[in-house]
């Protein structure tokens, strides 16, 4: 299901990079994504270019989440980067700024879909849903990774390690991770003891120990080996 973003947690201001062909937020000695891929596509006549990324392939619990983001080339937030390289506080600030200054779509594939389809196909399904929910539709996609989901309706390019190369993909990675982290905090309140507010469902020692002691919840992925073994006492 495609969704709008969760309520913002206060407005924040970060500087904007207003030039198309530069490294937004580039600091000396640091490598950050830039607008070069998007600028090359714009030179070919593509107007609405969406970056697409997903988060949550590795966790034992919770959905996989994808985001699609169309940036305004005149208002690109400074500091966009691979979400894993940013602090949670920085991601939260950029999340709110992106919702205010870009077109953003978020979608999920559920635990049930992950178990029925496999995690790769479920990840692609979430991406397809996020893209389909963009209105107006994009005319080109930059997809993080080396595979292009089969169900997309417009041209796309797969970009390996794209969240470190393209600001549009970096923006999508920030949006997807922030949404999913918030979701796992909410689920942690419903199912205390697994540490989801800290580990986001990933197989940390704390999480695996809680699985042994507390058992499997409806939000655990039964097709994942660690969960399957505990569920069926293998």
From Swiss-Prot:
Keyword Hydrolase: yes
Compartment annotation: Cytoplasm
SUPFAM superfamilies in UniProt: Ribonuclease H-like (SSF53098)
Domain RNase H type-2 residue range list: 47-234
Alphabetical list of Gene3D superfamilies matching this protein: Ribonuclease H-like superfamily/Ribonuclease H (3.30.420.10)
GO cellular component: cytoplasm; ribonuclease H2 complex
Biological-process GO terms, alphabetical: DNA replication, removal of RNA primer; mismatch repair
Reported cofactor(s): Mn(2+); Mg(2+)
Keyword terms: Cytoplasm, Endonuclease, Hydrolase, Manganese, Metal-binding, Nuclease
GO molecular function: manganese ion binding; RNA binding; RNA-DNA hybrid ribonuclease activity
Catalytic activity annotation: Endonucleolytic cleavage to 5'-phosphomonoester
Catalytic EC class: hydrolase
Highest taxon of source: Bacteria
NCBIfam families: PRK00015.1-1, PRK00015.1-3
PANTHER family the record matches: RIBONUCLEASE H2 SUBUNIT A (PTHR10954), RIBONUCLEASE HII (PTHR10954:SF18)
Known function: Endonuclease that specifically degrades the RNA of RNA-DNA hybrids.
Record-stated family: Belongs to the RNase HII family.
Protein's name in the database: Ribonuclease HII
Source taxonomy: Bacteria, Pseudomonadati, Pseudomonadota, Alphaproteobacteria, Rhodobacterales
